[in-house]
Amino acid sequence: MTELNKLTVADSIKGLKNKDFTSKELVNAHITQIEKHRNLNAYVTETFDLALKQAEAADQNYAQNQPRTLEGIPFAAKDLFCTKGIRTTACSNILKNFVPNYESSVTQNIFDKGGVMLGKTNMDEFAMGSANITSCFGNVISPWKANDDNADLVPGGSSGGSAAAVSGFMASAALGSDTGGSVRQPASFTGLVGFKPTYGRCSRYGMVSFASSLDQAGIFTRSVLDSSIMLEAMMGFDAKDSTSIKAEVPELQSAIGSSMKNIKIGVPLNLGEGGIEPDVMKIWQDTIELLKNAGAEIVDIILPHAKYGVAVYYVIAPAEASSNLSRYDGVRYGLRVERENMTLDEMYEMTRSAGFGEEVKRRIMIGTYVLSSNCMDAYYLKAQKVRRLVANDFNNAFEKVDAIVLPAAPTEAFKIAEKQNDPTIMYLNDLFTIPASLAGLPCASIPAGLSARGLPLGMQIIGKQLDEYNVLKVASTIESGVKHIKFEPAGF
């Protein structure tokens, strides 16, 4: 029998319904795995007592044949989802001891459907990073190793703790957030399915903000079916979020294994012109061939303004961050640095200097600069205009195709210290994920192959607004085509 912590969400639900094991046994298997691999630093807060209490309640519901859709399923939450009575830090010193008195809508949705929370996962500070190396709790180490080197690798970022937890069988599923690729890129690096729904599908209420016009909750799982199950539980209109979309939550599970007949797949050839590793290019070509053989029609498309995505993103996102993070002043909550006879301005300065890490300070400074009166027209407003052009490119493409397929990241996972001193190179890791974020489109990363060094590589599927169904359909087809490949880190 498969170890309980290695079961997918779907298989866990089936086993619990069949009474093959209890939720408490399932949770304990995950707790054992978490304790065994604490060196990966995936979790920053463990909630084992809560999980066991929730598991006992789940077992009672199964005994009474009244299970909810996620009854007894162990999950983890990125540490920017506010959890009532449980520390929520965004992995920043400025919030290191913050305990919210309310619950985020997304975690509440999962609790309402029977989910069991194992803990809060590590992340880049305020979700700013692509390698999970900016956390005040230290780096996250990927469960994966290259076959020619024993060096520690990054799990990607900013949702690296969630990716490491699911990839290392320390959670059945894990919540992440995706602003410019923070679910899709880590999923690519760790051999997982990472899904970011349409902007507004999941409530942002109770999520610590980075860039409000881009932030969206996402999910890590080990199968496409699991993604569909979790998304159905997470999504839905929320009056507490002004950006929430009033749209019915679709039935998504029927997308799995459905026919690719009459599906047109767009391939943006202009995005493969540079900065992409040969292994990634080969897997991209193999994936297109796989979809063609499955009955899809392949259509070459051009996204003319996507190449400006990174530049646009690193104007808009820091601008929004500088505004959002102005609330951390040491007055109302979070860290406060004090000394005798200090002025209010000195308290602000000392608190923010001590509370924010270097990457967050860098982005606040960039954001403040581009919003200044001298630069607003030249940078911020121009970036917003180009963002609209990027969105229009997608609208034009989707008049001809049903989905777009391209890599989730231009490289395989890299060593922990390899790129941290060059932020520009780190920013370019989101080259393929940022355009869809700027347009607010649903997208997923799906494991599509292994590099020559035995590391997972993910392909990204981008869909039309509110068309999570077709994204899952294409992802499921790719998943079926590579089922002979074992996306499992050695030793786990």
Curated annotation (Swiss-Prot):
Catalyzed reaction equations: L-glutamyl-tRNA(Gln) + L-glutamine + ATP + H2O = L-glutaminyl-tRNA(Gln) + L-glutamate + ADP + phosphate + H(+)
A GO biological-process term: translation
Enzyme Commission number, as recorded: 6.3.5.7
Covalent S-S links between cysteines: none
Active site feature: 78 (charge relay system), 158 (charge relay system), 182 (acyl-ester intermediate)
Keywords for the protein's UniProt record, in alphabetical order: ATP-binding, Ligase, Nucleotide-binding, Protein biosynthesis
Pfam families hit by this protein: Amidase
Subunit-structure text: Heterotrimer of A, B and C subunits.
Job of this protein: Allows the formation of correctly charged Gln-tRNA(Gln) through the transamidation of misacylated Glu-tRNA(Gln) in organisms which lack glutaminyl-tRNA synthetase. The reaction takes place in the presence of glutamine and ATP through an activated gamma-phospho-Glu-tRNA(Gln).
Protein name: Glutamyl-tRNA(Gln) amidotransferase subunit A
Annotated source species: Rickettsia akari (strain Hartford)
